[in-house]
């Protein structure tokens, strides 16, 4: 497996580096910046699991640490403000750097701070969950939630580099591992059927090298899509399969009941059911999706009686993918994907949605 993937970006090119030696790879990435101030942003879970790693950072660099509570509620303007306070207190300049080390929440949060502090300072991502390694760290999207709405404030701001190490996955709980698989299945279902089939048959306990290949294959797929459509005007929209409903579920559950990959799994099932109902997708493909989700213990239906189709529809109206008058869903097809535009006043769709949940 190649050690590096180079990503072309209209904003700034960057490398994805695969390694078992995080400290050395980070040192190589920093180069002359080793002498600059570095703010490591992480969460309490990662900080306690890898305290010796942070001690190494403190010995080698002019390092500061910001530790967030774990979970989606840290993706907030309040947390951004707290990090700004620390950067200002430590007199960080435009030449200093942020390094995120954690899952998707930490990466999105730290990247947003980097994009906005002094109108942009450099940052490096070290994703520690499967989901962040294969999905959220790739493509430059950064942002935070606002008033409960998912990823309402953000930008596209690529990092200097992304450091991928499967060593971090050795301490990853099964629930988080399955959430990463959810995003890998998403890209496989639409763009790479062999990847989907390999994930369906994968045996985590006995095939570490197989996992590394699947991660590389997933990242390569996303890299290809992002390079063709960085600002999500066409092909990259396909990566929102499951996300219109998934993000609404996360918002209504306050970003703590379902993890991201779980909410997206429910969204993918509903999108696939819509596609089947419109004759766009064979029923056998939906059945295959349901089977593999069940194998990885991912939810396939909404388990919250307090979240109604009506309340979900109201949240859909704030989705960033929408056009002026329409809510946009991404539907899988036999050969790829298509978009479904639902009028924001189409209350009949609420009844349809209720039957699919």
UniProtKB/Swiss-Prot annotation:
Function: Catalyzes the conversion of 3-deoxy-D-arabino-heptulosonate 7-phosphate (DAHP) to dehydroquinate (DHQ).
Keyword annotations: Amino-acid biosynthesis, Aromatic amino acid biosynthesis, Cobalt, Cytoplasm, Lyase, Metal-binding, NAD, Nucleotide-binding, Zinc
Spans traversing the lipid bilayer: none
Binding site for NAD(+): 104-108, 128-129, 141, 168-171
Matching InterPro entries: Dehydroquinate_synthase, DHQ_synth_AroB, DHQ_synth_fam, DHQS/DOIS_N, DHQS_C
Cofactor comment text: Binds 1 divalent metal cation per subunit. Can use either Co(2+) or Zn(2+).
Any matching Pfam family: DHQS_C
Identification of the protein by name: 3-dehydroquinate synthase
A GO molecular-function descriptor: metal ion binding
Residues that bind Zn(2+): 183, 243, 260
Coiled coil: none
Organism, scientific name: Streptococcus pyogenes serotype M6 (strain ATCC BAA-946 / MGAS10394)
Required cofactor names: NAD(+); Co(2+); Zn(2+)
Enzyme superclass (EC): lyase
